[in-house]
Regions:
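ABC ATPase nucleotide-binding domains
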Residues: 1-93
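C-terminal boundary and immediately downstream tail of ABC-type ATPase nucleotide-binding domains
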Residues: 87-110, 137
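Non-catalytic connector elements of ABC transporters
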Residues: 112-220
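Residues that scaffold the ATP/ADP-binding catalytic core of kinase and kinase-like folds
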Residues: 85-88, 97, 146, 218
C-alpha cells in the first residue's frame, strides 16, 4: 500500500481538476485496502475535487462514491445515486454489478406474474409487470425457508445440491425446478451463532419462499 499512498500524495500536491482512479486497490489485502480507503476519503474531503473512480467492487464504490455509472461493453447502461442503482437497478448489467447472484431471462405471463425462463419458476411480484420485461433478479440473501404446512404463493420445494462455508456465511446452491437449468440458485445464510445442525445441508429438500417485493424486474 505504500506505493498507493505516495501516488495519492503526488496527486494531491498537483491539485488536478479531476482525480481519476482505475481499480487502485485491486492488488491489496483487506487490511491495507481498508487503511487506504480512509486515506482516500481524507484526501477527497481536503481537496474538494470531482473524482472518477473505476471499480468492479460495488461495496467499495458505495463507500467511496456518491453516484454510480454502470458500464457494459463500453457503453453506459445506467447512472444514478447509490440508492437508485443498488435498490432499483434498471438493467441486467446493473443487477449483476450490484451483486445479484440469481438472474434469469423472464417473460410476462400475467398482470402481476412473471416466468423465470432459466429456472422453470413463476412468481407473483405484487405489482404490474412491464410488457417488455427481459430479466428478473433475486439477491442471494432475499429469500428464506417457508415453514408453513401448505406451499403458498412464491414458494418452491428445492433440493440442496451443495453447500460451502466462508467465515460468517454458508452459501447454499439450490437446484431449480427446470431439469436443464443453466445455473443453480444461490442462497446466503448467516451462520454466526447457529449450530452446525441448524444450517442447511447438502441433500436436503427445503421449501423456499421468495418475497414478491424483493424480486427485481428489468427490461434490458
Amino acid at each position: 500500500g505504500q506505493q498507493q499512498r505516495v501516488a495519492l500524495a503526488r496527486m494531491g500536491a498537483a491539485r488536478p481538476g479531476i482525480f481519476m482512479f482505475d481499480e487502485p486497490m485491486s492488488a491489496l489485502d483487506s487490511y491495507l485496502k481498508s487503511a487506504l480507503e480512509q486515506n482516500m476519503l481524507d484526501l477527497f474531503d481536503v481537496c474538494n475535487r470531482t473524482v472518477l473512480y473505476v471499480s468492479h467492487d460495488i461495496d467499495e464504490a458505495c463507500r467511496l462514491c456518491e453516484r454510480i455509472c454502470v458500464m457494459h461493453n463500453g457503453h453506459v447502461e445506467e447512472i444514478g445515486s447509490i440508492e437508485d442503482v443498488v435498490r432499483r437497478p434498471q438493467t441486467l448489467a446493473a443487477l449483476r454489478l450490484t451483486g445479484c447472484k440469481n438472474t434469469s431471462r423472464a417473460r410476462k405471463i400475467g398482470e402481476e406474474e412473471v416466468e423465470a425462463l432459466d429456472w422453470g419458476m413463476t412468481f407473483n411480484v405484487g405489482r404490474e409487470v412491464p410488457d417488455n420485461v427481459a430479466y428478473l433478479g433475486i439477491r442471494a440473501s432475499y429469500f428464506h425457508v417457508d415453514n408453513r404446512a401448505e406451499r403458498g404463493r412464491n414458494s418452491y420445494d428445492l433440493h440442496v445440491a451443495r453447500v460451502s462455508d466462508s467465515r460468517f456465511e454458508r452459501l447454499v446452491l439450490l437446484d431449480a425446478p427446470r431439469v436443464d437449468a443453466p445455473t443453480r440458485l444461490q442462497w446466503k445464510v448467516n451462520k454466526v451463532g447457529v449450530p452446525a445442525d441448524g444450517l442447511p445441508q447438502a441433500g436436503e429438500t427445503l421449501r423456499m419462499h421468495f418475497d414478491a417485493s424483493k424480486i427485481h424486474l428489468v427490461c434490458r
